Amino acid sequence: WPSDFDATGRRIAVIGSAATAVQLVPALTGIAARLDVHQRHANSLWPKPDGRYPRWYRPFAVAERGVFRALGELFSRGLDDRSVLGRAHRAITSWRLRSQVRDPRLRAQLTPDYTIGCKRILFSNDYYPALTRDDVQLLTDPIARITPTGVVTRDQAGAETEREVDA
């Protein structure tokens, strides 16, 4: 990303919807005039445990690594769809999507068609809300070509853009 690039008022196409896009799209909303997000596959998205640690917690930070290792083990056992944890994974991701995306069509586009854990699980608190904005469009039709003026999908969707970003 060029350090001198100013996205203000620009029409931007974000090609991809994985980890980079999950960070980039919310950052560009409200700055760019329009975002077209080109998605090939939906991702499993979990809440991002973001926030400040309270002062009382700081002495326990050393033990945190062990806690996260234990949680990782527990988490990986939940990738089996038949397990209680697997059902919990599905319930959490489904609830998160329903609570943040009201449009059923957009929600369907954002629902993974594979078992959780088959692809990288992403963490974000603001990606889904960013995609519900009027100035953001999620495009799931395959890209047919990239022209000097923008990205064109197989169904001819897409519009002129001033910058394409591979994410």
Task: Give a label for each model feature.
Residues 1-4, 113-116, 136-154:
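A conserved short coil-to-beta-strand element within the FAD-binding core of flavoproteins
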Residues 1-102:
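Rossmann-like dinucleotide-binding core of oxidoreductases
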Residues 6-10, 157-167:
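Core beta-strand elements of the Rossmann-like FAD/NAD(P) dinucleotide-binding domain
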Residues 106-118:
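Helix-loop-beta segment of a Rossmann-like dinucleotide-binding subdomain
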